Amino acid sequence: MALVLAAAGAVTVVQFRDAAHEADPDGALRGLTDDITADLVRELVTILPIVLVIAAVAAYLLSRAALRPVDRIRAAAQTLTTTPHPDTDAPLPVPPTDDEIAWLATTLNTMLTRLQRALAHEQQFVADASHELRTPLALLTTELELRCAGPDPPTS
């Protein structure tokens, strides 16, 4: 037999031994703890799956929100690599936070700037080399055309 007393917000459970547990002096306490354990297991089996689902959904949403800046950087880099003539002056987006993702975006933008400068130097070198090669070839072509066109001019 159990008696539950509630007063001033405190709950007290008083368990009286019954005749079935007369031979066992701790029978009343053992029966009470078995009941409490069974209730606790039943509540955990009911509540734990719900808590796990809520935690999984919260973790998924939180990770998506945390990785959104990385996805923006990835999309901008993908645009740069798939566009035939990308706007290389448009940098990758840098999130307004002062964390590793912002540092990564800043570093990638610095690298892109250096690559643009290197490409510009290479294009200038090719243009200069092309000009330097065309000038002697043009002179040779002109001289050959003149020689093929007529007799040699008199030499003095």
From Swiss-Prot:
Coiled coil: none
Swiss-Prot/TrEMBL keywords: Cell membrane, Kinase, Membrane, Phosphoprotein, Transferase, Transmembrane, Transmembrane helix, Two-component regulatory system
Domain (Histidine kinase): residue spans on this chain: 128-156
GO molecular function, one term: protein kinase activity
Extracellular side: 1-42
CDD domains: HAMP
Location in the cell: Cell membrane
Post-translational modification remark: Phosphorylated by HK1.
Superkingdom of origin organism: Bacteria
InterPro entries: HAMP_dom, HisK_dim/P_sf, TCS_sensor_his_kinase
Start and end residues of each HAMP domain: 64-120
A single GO BP: negative regulation of phosphorelay signal transduction system
One GO location term (cellular component): plasma membrane
Leading EC class: transferase
Oligomer and partners: Homodimer. Each monomer interacts with HK1 and the receiver domain of TcrA.
Function description: Member of the three-protein two-component system HK1/HK2/TcrA. HK2 transfers its phosphoryl group to TcrA.
Misc note: HK1 and HK2 are merged into a single protein with a distinct N-terminal sequence in strain CDC 1551 / Oshkosh.
The name this protein goes by in its record: Sensor histidine kinase component HK2
